[in-house]
UniProtKB/Swiss-Prot annotation:
Originating species: Pseudomonas putida (strain W619)
Lineage: Bacteria, Pseudomonadati, Pseudomonadota, Gammaproteobacteria, Pseudomonadales
UniProt xrefs under InterPro entries: Ecotin_C, Ecotin_sf, Prot_inh_ecotin, Prot_inh_ecotin_gammaproteobac
Signal peptide: 1-22
Keyword terms, alphabetized: Disulfide bond, Periplasm, Protease inhibitor, Serine protease inhibitor, Signal
One protein family per Pfam: Ecotin
Record site: Reactive bond: 102-103
Family, as annotated: Belongs to the protease inhibitor I11 (ecotin) family.
Descriptive protein name: Ecotin
Alphabetical list of HAMAP family matching this protein: Ecotin
Assembly: Homodimer.
Compartment list: Periplasm
GO MF annotation terms: serine-type endopeptidase inhibitor activity
Gene, per the UniProt record: eco
Length: 159
């Protein structure tokens, strides 16, 4: 029996440990196409050593002309299950607003800014093994932020 070259072993090891983000969505599962008036947006997360210490925040929103007030849109991100597979995907059906604070803006200047949708369901479990699939109405952008837990744990006081 011939010894296996080190380069072959290294190549096989790298292929086996490649992140799921290398695969296209169709290679993972038959997620439905976006319905008319919606887009399907996908997030591929890198693997982390301790994924339980991380959360994924979905920031769906629109780029709008805003003044000095704080702007926000309203909506709820709902979790659905891909039948026969058990994989989750998320859907934002309606986006309301915008709503704004009512501060006086003396200069009256407007700038373009990303205005997020605020509501329930936007903080998700971190899972690099599967893509995060989000269906949103046309014109809505999906951005995301990864949160991590601090290693510094505090003790509560008994009072």
């Amino acid at each position: 029996m011939r010894p296996t070259p080190l380069s072959t072993i290294l190549a096989l090891t790298m292929a086996a440990t490649a992140p799921a983000m290398a695969a296209s969505l169709k290679d993972v599962a038959p997620y439905p196409e976006a319905e008319k008036g919606f887009t399907r947006q996908v997030i591929h997360l890198p693997a982390q050593a301790d994924e339980q210490a991380y959360k994924l925040e979905i920031l769906a929103g629109k780029t709008l002309q805003v003044d000095c007030n704080r702007q926000r849109l309203a909506g709820s991100l709902e979790e659905h299950t891909l039948e026969g597979w058990g994989y989750n995907y998320y859907r934002l059906d309606k986006v309301g607003g915008p709503a704004s604070t009512l501060m006086a803006c003396p200069d009256g200047k407007k700038t373009e800014a990303f205005v997020p949708v605020v509501g329930e369901g936007f903080l998700l479990r971190y899972n690099s093994k599967l893509p995060v699939v989000v269906y949103v109405p046309d014109g809505v952008q999906v951005r995301y932020r990864v949160w991590s837990a601090s290693q510094d744990v505090q003790k509560a006081k008994v009072e």
